[in-house]
């Protein structure tokens, strides 16, 4: 008679297994890979708390689009803003985000995931007040730089926190909440920007971090971080809070401890050497690839310069109304993805996303080419908005949120902080390059050429997803790590495991 090990059972099955009790009788029980998957209320609270920070990030990302119009109006602004300075108002935030992303890695390792997230709240408030009270362009740039630094830290720490606290059954859904709330922030900025100038918009931005700070104070640190610090009892309490008072958290805690001990045995004393190990390099390169194709889709150029793009297109629809429509669609598409991601999986949504973006970017490029050739486009003035709507739906349902979700899933626990720091820094480097050079690209190859360029990048991104990106739907972090590092046992016999028979 061969007894099967519970740890060998595949993640997607819930097999019935007979165990022999102390009195010699067989006991039938269900092996569940996680504890109490029904109780998720506290996990929802934790997800909402950190996602409020993402709303601040979204507001900061969208600020340039409505603010620059009034900032460059000399009847509103007491100081002059040149075109070059205006480009830095948009470009300095991703550059500072790069610095924040690099600094965020050590922060989440030594301060903890929660404390790092919480530490961004007050600097966010200070940054927005600097902009609101600015009497020179330098104060605006200082505020944008400080907010960008916080955005970089938040971009790194939010997905790591959620990846380490939420159960696999709902990790996809709750893991997309930061993106959904980020899109709420974008929408708030677009709507408010229609009615207030750049200074009033900054005052609104200074209010948003307050509820984020209050809610974050209520949630625990991640159990996995406590385990890495040798605080097993604190990890147990955090798990109990997250899974419910009546949940048996011991199996999950033992799995976390075992995974950490295994990672420690394979780790070197040098973090850089750990990153460069072949087993760790694979998930890191996949994360970098996802970030590259996310930003080279041109999304930040679209968000930062939405009003200007519609003005250049000669759209018959009010420019500010266009940005609000795009914001509403962005928000709605993310919630659509939130509903589907744990049903369809990550890769299917990425396929749909990339295809939609390829088609719409090529369409936009063709529209601008037709217009720039001197043709009358007044009868298709609706086309830029229609293309933008489909483009945003495509981005927000896959390429936008999923790379951040997978950042907290595929990176091994031992290097999660440093690897996430590298990936986030790389993301913001790409963001800065695209944002700062978008105007130069348009000047060099025309706006039609710019959209065609981004469309080709999205097409390449589709093939990257097909051949290199793994499916993580429904898998625990420990199982994903074993698979990515090539330490998964062959489980064909376990997958077909039958109840053991006993002669009684």
UniProtKB/Swiss-Prot annotation:
Any single GO BP term: trehalose transport
CDD domains: MFS_GLUT6_8_Class3_like
Segments on the Extracellular face: 61-87, 142-145, 193-199, 305-320, 369-387, 446-448
GO terms of molecular function: sugar transmembrane transporter activity; trehalose transmembrane transporter activity
Cytoplasmic side: 1-39, 109-120, 167-171, 221-283, 342-347, 409-424, 470-504
PROSITE patterns membership: MFS, SUGAR_TRANSPORT_1, SUGAR_TRANSPORT_2
UniProt pH dependence: Wide extracellular pH range, between 4.0 and 9.0.
Transmembrane segments: 40-60, 88-108, 121-141, 146-166, 172-192, 200-220, 284-304, 321-341, 348-368, 388-408, 425-445, 449-469
Domain of life, per lineage: Eukaryota
Glycosylated sites: 73, 197
Subcellular location: Cell membrane
Induction pattern: By hypersalinity.
UniProt-listed InterPro entries: MFS_dom, MFS_ERD6/Tret1-like, MFS_sugar_transport-like, MFS_trans_sf, MFS_Trehalose_Transporter, Sugar/inositol_transpt, Sugar_transporter_CS
Annotated membrane topology: Multi-pass membrane protein
Pfam family for this entry, one: Sugar_tr
Family of the protein in this entry: Belongs to the major facilitator superfamily. Sugar transporter (TC 2.A.1.1) family. Trehalose transporter subfamily.
NCBIfam families xrefs: SP
Function: High-capacity facilitative transporter for trehalose, required to induce anhydrobiosis. Anhydrobiotic larvae can survive almost complete dehydration. Does not transport maltose, sucrose or lactose. Mediates the bidirectional transfer of trehalose. Responsible for the transport of trehalose synthesized in the fat body and the incorporation of trehalose into other tissues that require a carbon source, thereby regulating trehalose levels in the hemolymph.
Stated name of the protein: Facilitated trehalose transporter Tret1
């Amino acid at each position: 008679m061969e007894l099967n090990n519970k740890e060998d059972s595949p993640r997607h099955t819930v097999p019935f297994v007979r165990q022999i009790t102390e009195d010699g009788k067989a006991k039938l029980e269900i092996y569940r890979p996680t504890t109490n998957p029904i109780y998720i209320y506290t996990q929802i609270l934790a997800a909402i708390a950190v996602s409020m920070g993402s709303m601040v990030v979204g507001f900061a990302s969208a600020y340039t689009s409505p603010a620059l119009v009034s900032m460059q109006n000399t009847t509103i602004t007491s100081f002059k803003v040149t075109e070059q300075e205006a480009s830095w108002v948009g470009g300095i935030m991703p550059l500072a985000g790069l610095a924040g992303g690099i600094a965020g890695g050590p922060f989440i390792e030594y301060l903890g995931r929660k404390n790092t997230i919480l530490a961004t709240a007050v600097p966010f408030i200070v940054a927005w007040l600097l902009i609101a009270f600015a009497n020179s362009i330098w104060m605006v740039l200082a505020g944008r730089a400080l907010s960008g630094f916080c955005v970089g830290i938040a971009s790194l720490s939010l997905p790591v926190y959620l990846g380490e606290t939420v159960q696999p059954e709902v990790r996809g859904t709750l893991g997309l909440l930061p993106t959904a709330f980020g899109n709420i922030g974008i929408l708030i900025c677009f709507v408010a920007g229609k009615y207030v100038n750049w200074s009033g918009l900054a005052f609104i931005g200074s209010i948003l971090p307050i509820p984020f700070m209050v809610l974050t104070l209520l949630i625990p640190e991640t159990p996995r971080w406590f385990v890495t610090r040798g605080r097993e009892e604190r990890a147990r309490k955090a798990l109990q809070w997250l899974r419910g008072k009546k949940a048996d958290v011991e199996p999950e805690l033992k799995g976390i401890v075992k995974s950490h001990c295994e990672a420690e045995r394979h780790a070197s004393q040098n973090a850089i050497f750990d990153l460069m190990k072949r087993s760790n390099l694979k998930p890191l390169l996949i994360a970098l690839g996802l970030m590259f194709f996310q930003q080279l889709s041109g999304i930040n150029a679209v968000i930062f310069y939405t009003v200007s793009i519609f003005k250049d297109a000669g759209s018959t629809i009010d420019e500010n109304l266009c940005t609000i429509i795009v914001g509403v669609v962005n928000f709605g598409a993310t919630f659509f993805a939130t509903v589907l991601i744990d049903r369809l999986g990550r890769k299917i949504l990425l396929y749909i996303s990339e295809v939609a973006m390829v088609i719409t970017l090529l369409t936009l490029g063709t529209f601008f080419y037709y217009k720039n050739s001197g043709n009358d486009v007044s009868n298709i003035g609706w086309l830029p908005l229609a293309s933008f709507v489909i483009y945003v739906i495509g981005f927000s349902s896959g390429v936008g949120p999923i790379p951040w979700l997978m950042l907290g899933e595929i990176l091994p626990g031992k290097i999660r902080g440093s690897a996430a720091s590298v990936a986030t820094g790389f993301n913001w480097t790409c963001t800065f390059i695209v944002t700062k050079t978008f105007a130069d690209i348009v000047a060099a190859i025309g706006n039609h050429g710019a959209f065609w360029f981004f469309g080709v990048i999205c097409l390449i991104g589709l093939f990257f997803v097909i051949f290199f990106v793994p499916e993580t739907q429904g898998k625990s972090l420990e199982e994903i790590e074993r698979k990515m590092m090539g330490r998964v046992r062959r489980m064909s016999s376990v997958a077909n495991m039958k109840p053991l028979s006993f002669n009684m």
